[in-house]
Amino acid sequence: MVIKRQDDATSAEPLEGGLRDGLFVEQRRRVDDFDFGKNTAVVFDDMLDRSVPFYSEIQRMVAELAVDFAADGTTIYDLGCSTATTIAQIDRGLPAGMDVRYVGIDSSPEMLALAAKKLAESGVTRPCELRHGDLNSNLEISNASVVLLVLTLQFVRPLHRERIIREIYEGLEPNGCLILVEKVLGENSAFNRLFINHYYEMKRRNGYSDLEIAQKREALENVLVPYRFEENKELLRGQGFRHVDTFFKWYNFCAMVAMKG
């Protein structure tokens, strides 16, 4: 059963997701800041598949770890849940009868509308609440065994990141985990240039043109603010996480798991 808050603003017009990403195919006279509205939402799944290296494998790994840490009577939070791909994947891996509920939070009503549709089509029967919310504001996290930040924290203004991690830590039950997947900077400028070049080569292999790559890069310039790997690790440790490890790394992408001791 999918449960929605009355104020979650998911009453947008019906949307069909799964379209091919062509947001930046045409030359634009002016490239506006990237956003997660309707035009992005309907192509978002394809965008991730073609823009994030080994995306399906990352999703599988995130789901496996979430299942490892999920506990009866607790809540699994997905912060920046977008179209709920991760929640659906986790639900398939949980043992039958495990009593957990999901909370998905996203700032885009259109993403939440597609999330509700995907969860219904995936046959998710555990309780799931989809909330319209901005991570730049205060979070409400409690009784959590798992909290996910999958390619989300990089879009949060840096001045709010410590607070978010602290609120996650405080809302986790003992032995609960935070799973963090981020685009990251190289530890020095030479490595960073190499990693970015190879990333763009990957996008070309996946069908993006140089124009699309350039225009999306410009759109993201003031929106996506990545940290270095060590900065993210220090951020987690600084807010209380003592056990932090890396489970995926590809050039300028990294995935980490942190456990509350």
Specify the residue positions occupied by each region the protein language model found:
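Class I SAM-dependent methyltransferase Rossmann-like catalytic core
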Residues: R29-D33, K38-I58
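Conserved alpha-helix/loop element of class I SAM-dependent methyltransferases that forms part
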Residues: F54-D72
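Class I SAM-dependent methyltransferase SAM/SAH-binding core
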Residues: Y77-D78, A84-S137
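A short acidic, Gly/Pro-enriched loop at the edge of an enzyme's catalytic core
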Residues: L139-V147
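A short glycine-rich, Lys/Arg-flanked "PGG" loop and its adjoining helix->strand segment in the class I
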Residues: E162-P174
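Conserved class I S-adenosyl-L-methionine
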Residues: C177-R205
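Short alpha-helix
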Residues: N222-Q239
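Core SAM-dependent methyltransferase catalytic element
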Residues: R242-G261
